[in-house]
């Protein structure tokens, strides 16, 4: 098969990262977790006491993705591995706000385009098919019900030892959907040439197989 790029977009907790990792593994491609980039910048934003000088924040930031056999993708922020700090509730609650800022978006998108230049990339996010990889060979827009997404987030939090309330998670996801879809810069939307894939009630294996079937149709 020729070298291709695959873009997976969709709202929070639609299963993008989990599926992207699986697809990349099955196809011996490289998975790029763009959300982790925004989470890393949000982590720094919080460490800087919620600075509003986002241009200065990114100007004074180095951000790299590395791969370790025991951990998979690791995020190196200012020469520190911050991977284990990026899924806490504080980062999750602020990441949409930070990611909506133009200096942050420009900084991350530039990095993402550089990573995808050689092809062989599976990338997931909110604006991959529309902004980062508009020429991706396959674009999939993943959706799922709010209830299912809240359940996934609840289970993920349990595995990480993070206490959470199911109803609060539902409200947070609904609020984030509205914020992501209505933000001025790179709003969440389906690319015109993307395939919609509803993952509600489907297993990881089922969704992975559906995407692999799409890949097999690429000429």
From Swiss-Prot:
Query: Which CDD domains does the record associate with it?
Result: CMPK (cd02020)
EC number(s) reported in the record: 2.7.4.25
Q: Which GO terms describe its cellular component?
A: cytosol
Alphabetically, which GO biological process terms does the record hold?
nucleobase-containing small molecule interconversion; pyrimidine nucleotide metabolic process
Q: Where does ATP bind?
A: 10-18
Which SUPFAM superfamilies does this UniProt record tie to the protein? P-loop containing nucleoside triphosphate hydrolases
Location in the cell reads: Cytoplasm
Keywords, in A-Z order: ATP-binding, Cytoplasm, Kinase, Nucleotide-binding, Transferase
Q: Which reaction does it catalyse?
A: CMP + ATP = CDP + ADP; dCMP + ATP = dCDP + ADP
Tagged with keyword Cell wall biogenesis/degradation = no
One molecular function GO term is: ATP binding
Does Kinase show up as a keyword for this record?
A: yes
Q: Which InterPro entries match?
A: Cytidylate_kin, Cytidylate_kinase_dom, P-loop_NTPase
Q: Which HAMAP family does the entry mention?
A: Cytidyl_kinase_type1
Per the similarity annotation, which family is this?
Belongs to the cytidylate kinase family. Type 1 subfamily.
This chain's protein is named Cytidylate kinase
Q: Gene name?
A: cmk
